[in-house]
């Protein structure tokens, strides 16, 4: 499932959380980019395949890869072969967009929950610097041993990470640890923490997300802008 046709536009690939669909995400996110000045931003909302999830009692739901446990903690180990297969699918979408003529600096990979985990894994292993990666209530689904596999160009992609401190599905510690790891390896990761927020998207996050995308597209480059801090930002 490819992204929008090429041209002088910003491209946002949005990866939903497990149990959701791309159309559900579209209904929630797309209205924030409906203003005329954002008409150049094109979204893609693919839907994950379905599979039986043992930790949900064998329920068949959409999922990008296996879910080993709930809640997800900073120590949760994922089936990395499955994660990498999902990453390959995302890379195919990105390759298609670049081949169609879109500048990598205008491409953003974003996601919620498991989709956020897949987004950051995909960006870290992609051989080009992208416009950015945005993680909502996600985690890092690969062990730290994969750090040596991160291309130098991927390390230049800026990251924005949102996480609620009341999240009971993907614990706050998992998001905090993921962003801290990115900073340890020299990446720009802005972390937005929300004390009362659970495992969901809220208006404040989406408004900040919209402005973040606008700022980067106005630059025409994926490098961080001076106004964004790579320090932990407690809301």
UniProtKB/Swiss-Prot annotation:
InterPro entries: AB_hydrolase_fold (IPR029058), LYPA1-2/EST-like (IPR050565), PLipase/COase/thioEstase (IPR003140). Keywords: Fatty acid metabolism, Hydrolase, Lipid metabolism. Belongs to the AB hydrolase superfamily. AB hydrolase 2 family. This is Probable carboxylesterase Os04g0669600. It holds the Pfam family Abhydrolase_2. GO terms for biological process: fatty acid metabolic process; regulation of plant-type hypersensitive response. The keyword Hydrolase applies. Its EC number is 3.1.1.-. The keyword Lipid metabolism applies. It is an enzyme of class 3 (hydrolase). Possesses carboxylesterase activity in vitro. It comes from the Eukaryota. Signal peptide: none annotated. GO terms for cellular component: cytoplasm. GO terms for molecular function: carboxylic ester hydrolase activity; palmitoyl-(protein) hydrolase activity. It comes from Oryza sativa subsp. japonica (Rice). The active site is at 113 (charge relay system), 167 (charge relay system), 199 (charge relay system).
């Amino acid at each position: 499932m490819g992204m929008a046709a090429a041209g002088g536009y910003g491209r946002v690939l949005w990866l939903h959380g497990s149990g959701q669909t791309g159309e559900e995400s579209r209904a929630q996110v797309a209205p924030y980019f409906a203003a005329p000045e954002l008409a150049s931003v094109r979204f893609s909302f693919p839907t994950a395949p379905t599979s039986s999830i043992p930790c949900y009692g064998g329920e068949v739901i959409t999922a990008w890869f296996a879910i080993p446990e709930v809640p997800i903690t900073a120590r949760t180990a994922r089936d990395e072969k499955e994660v990498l297969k999902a990453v390959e699918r995302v890379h195919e979408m990105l390759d298609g967009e670049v081949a169609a003529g879109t500048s990598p600096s205008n491409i953003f990979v974003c996601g919620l929950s498991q989709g956020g985990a897949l987004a950051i894994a995909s960006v870290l292993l992609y051989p080009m610097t992208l416009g950015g990666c945005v993680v909502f209530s996600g985690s890092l689904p690969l062990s730290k041993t994969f750090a040596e596999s991160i291309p130098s160009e991927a390390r230049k992609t800026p990251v924005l990470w949102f996480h609620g401190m009341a999240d009971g599905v993907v614990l706050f510690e998992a998001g905090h640890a993921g962003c801290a790891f990115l900073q340890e390896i020299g990446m720009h990761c802005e972390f937005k923490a929300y004390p009362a927020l659970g495992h969901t998207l809220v208006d404040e996050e989406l408004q900040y997300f919209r402005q973040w995308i606008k700022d980067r597209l106005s630059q025409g480059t994926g490098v961080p802008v001076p106004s964004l801090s790579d320090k932990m930002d407690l809301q």
